[in-house]
């Protein structure tokens, strides 16, 4: 249960009970009242700005109104004390019995604790990675892959019906270049000396194997075909090979999409999907024939000093109108974006999230314009931009050669440090801030390495369970037994740990609402820190040890507390896509 939602309801009921009205006699708007943890934990457990928010409408001084509300809140059986602070904040401190009851709820819910109905089954499409199928995934793709995947997992846990989607950019000019590059490697595999890879083609050695496979399958047949026919075959085989490599890279990172959508699907049957999308916009009055003035600076590829078919995107929030069809009748890349959005919308998605690299910042307004025009303002579109990842080793930048074809791949990073450190650390800064990734730091066994610190807390929980088996003979811990003596948990440090656990449902909902999965990584680190601190208190003070052989009831209660810590760590790490280890060496 979200205790802050619980007290939000209680506070609003209290406001109704004291018959609080607007000074003109009307009903008060209580929807904007905030109920949250105080910034300083010493101030209490629950804070609300109700008095400050309502004082003007009520016509009463904020502190006087706060005192009136506080007096009424003292009647709540779970409230130990109520204080008014500053200009009119109301801080509530709750009784230990309330936290003990909440801990029992958490224990009974297990790893489902924190799961929310916030999304109410609403369909959400999360598109992420969508790397061009022209080579292996590089480290620059890694952050977007993790942010998108964890956000999708988070939204599912918050009750949304989520589809994870990958858009395969397999219809552009870069695919033609790729096919010609592989054709060269095919000829090389047949024994021809190809010399230096010509400028403009893909030089990567990863294409050698594709050429060899084509030589093994076709022999010299491709050389005997008309070039266009041979290139069509090479293109199909190469896209399949590249996507197999990309899927394998993503699998190594524990990223699994539900849908792989091919751009070429939009171009079948004379680009019927694109034509239909443009016709739909035309019927709505969003398309016209015209000429665009030349943009300042470098000219984009789709600008022509001729009449084109244009999208009135400025009428729906964009900076300039966008070309859909060139003067020669060919479609722009943007026209494909319109058709792809329409396809998603027609599949029943009213909410779509695009996770893109920071270099796609210029796409945001045009995509938002497409969403407004195609859906008549009914669809919600969000674009999350992921800033660059800078690689370090022992604090020194990792240099990547500028020579063509040389870069650090996603697989290189995962193979060196492991999947879990990569996933966790890619979340350890907000997506729109640059991130430093140090190979040495993420494998360090210290508090300064967040993923180690969190996973070590999980392992420590299980070491407590093993100690319980050795010292108390409790091999199979029973949740009913563990939850039957929570009234024995009275030490302030234990109650503080319960408070931290109780934040989890609110954290899940706020991270989902704001689409900020990094909040989960921060919370897990804070929870791990609280648990390690409690462990250390037991080391310093025998009375606070999790297991007291001479007091089995207290031991069971503390084991129940450890079990809930383990459950929340497991839940959060599962959403992140990392393991919750039972032991670490």
UniProtKB/Swiss-Prot annotation:
Protein name: Arginine--tRNA ligase
Gene3D superfamilies: Arginyl tRNA synthetase N-terminal domain, HUPs, Isoleucyl-tRNA Synthetase, Domain 1
Chief location bin: cytoplasm
Motif 'HIGH' region boundaries: 131-141
Family under the similarity heading: Belongs to the class-I aminoacyl-tRNA synthetase family.
Originating organism: Brucella suis (strain ATCC 23445 / NCTC 10510)
GO CC, alphabetical: cytoplasm
Keyword terms of this UniProt record: Aminoacyl-tRNA synthetase, ATP-binding, Cytoplasm, Ligase, Nucleotide-binding, Protein biosynthesis
Source species, domain of life: Bacteria
Family annotation (SUPFAM superfamilies): Anticodon-binding domain of a subclass of class I aminoacyl-tRNA synthetases, Arginyl-tRNA synthetase (ArgRS), N-terminal 'additional' domain, Nucleotidylyl transferase
GO molecular function: arginine-tRNA ligase activity; ATP binding
Pfam families: Arg_tRNA_synt_N, DALR_1, tRNA-synt_1d
EC numbers, comma separated: 6.1.1.19
UniProt GO BP: arginyl-tRNA aminoacylation
Enzyme class: ligase
Complexes and interactors: Monomer.
């Amino acid at each position: 249960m979200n205790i802050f939602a619980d007290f939000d309801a209680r506070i609003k009921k209290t406001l109704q009970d004291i018959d609080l009205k607007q000074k003109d006699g009307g009903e008060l708007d209580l929807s904007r009242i905030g109920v949250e943890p105080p910034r300083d934990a010493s101030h209490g457990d629950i804070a609300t700005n109700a008095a400050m928010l309502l004082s003007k409408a009520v016509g009463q001084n904020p502190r006087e109104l706060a005192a009136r509300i506080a007096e009424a809140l003292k009647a709540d059986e779970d409230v130990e004390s109520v204080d008014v602070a500053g200009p009119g904040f109301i801080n509530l401190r709750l009784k230990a019995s309330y936290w003990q009851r909440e801990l029992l709820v958490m224990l009974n819910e297990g790893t489902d604790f924190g799961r929310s109905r916030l999304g109410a089954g609403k369909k959400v499409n999360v598109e992420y990675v969508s790397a061009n199928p022209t080579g292996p995934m590089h480290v620059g793709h890694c952050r977007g892959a993790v942010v998108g995947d964890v956000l999708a997992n988070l939204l599912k846990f918050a009750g949304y019906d989520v589809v994870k989607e990958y858009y395969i950019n397999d219809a552009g000019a870069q695919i033609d270049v790729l096919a010609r590059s592989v054709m060269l490697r095919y000829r090389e595999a047949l024994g021809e000396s190809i010399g230096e890879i010509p400028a403009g083609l893909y030089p990567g050695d990863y294409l050698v194997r594709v050429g060899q496979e084509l030589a093994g399958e076709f022999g010299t047949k491709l050389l005997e075909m008309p070039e266009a026919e041979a290139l069509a075959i090479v293109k199909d085989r190469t896209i399949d090979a590249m996507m197999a490599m990309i899927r394998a890279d993503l699998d190594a990172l524990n990223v699994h999409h539900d849908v792989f959508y091919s751009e070429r699907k939009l171009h079948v049957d004379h680009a019927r999907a694109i034509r239909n999308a443009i016709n739909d916009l035309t019927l709505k009055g969003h398309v016209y024939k015209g000429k665009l003035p030349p943009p300042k600076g470098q000219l984009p590829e789709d600008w022509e000093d001729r009449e084109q078919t244009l999208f009135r995107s400025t009428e729906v929030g964009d900076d300039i109108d966008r070309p859909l069809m060139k003067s020669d009748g060919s479609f722009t890349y943007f026209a494909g974006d319109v058709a792809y959005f329409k396809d998603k919308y027609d599949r029943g998605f009213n909410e779509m999230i695009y996770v893109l690299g920071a270099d796609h910042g210029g796409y945001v307004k045009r995509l938002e314009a497409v969403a407004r025009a195609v859906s008549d303002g009914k669809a919600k579109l969000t674009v999350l931009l992921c800033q660059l990842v800078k690689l370090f080793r022992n604090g020194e930048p990792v240099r990547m050669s500028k020579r063509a074809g040389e870069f650090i791949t996603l697989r290189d990073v995962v193979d060196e440090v492991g999947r879990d450190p990569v996933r966790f650390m890619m979340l350890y800064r907000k997506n729109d801030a640059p991130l430093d990734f140090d190979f040495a730091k993420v494998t360090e066994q210290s508090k300064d390495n967040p993923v180690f610190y969190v996973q070590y807390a999980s392992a420590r929980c299980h070491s407590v369970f093993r100690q319980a088996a050795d010292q108390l003979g409790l091999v199979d811990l029973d949740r009913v037994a563990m939850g039957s003596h929570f009234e024995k948990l009275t030490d302030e440090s234990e109650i503080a740990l319960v408070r931290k656990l109780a934040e989890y449902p609110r954290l899940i909902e706020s991270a989902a609402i704001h689409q900020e999965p990094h909040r989960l990584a921060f919370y897990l680190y804070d929870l791990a820190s609280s648990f390690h601190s409690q462990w250390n208190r037991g080391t310093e003070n025998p009375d606070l040890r999790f297991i007291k052989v001479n007091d089995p009831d207290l031991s069971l209660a503390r084991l129940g507390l450890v079990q809930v810590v383990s459950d929340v760590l497991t839940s959060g790490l599962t959403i992140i896509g990392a393991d919750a280890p039972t032991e670490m060496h």
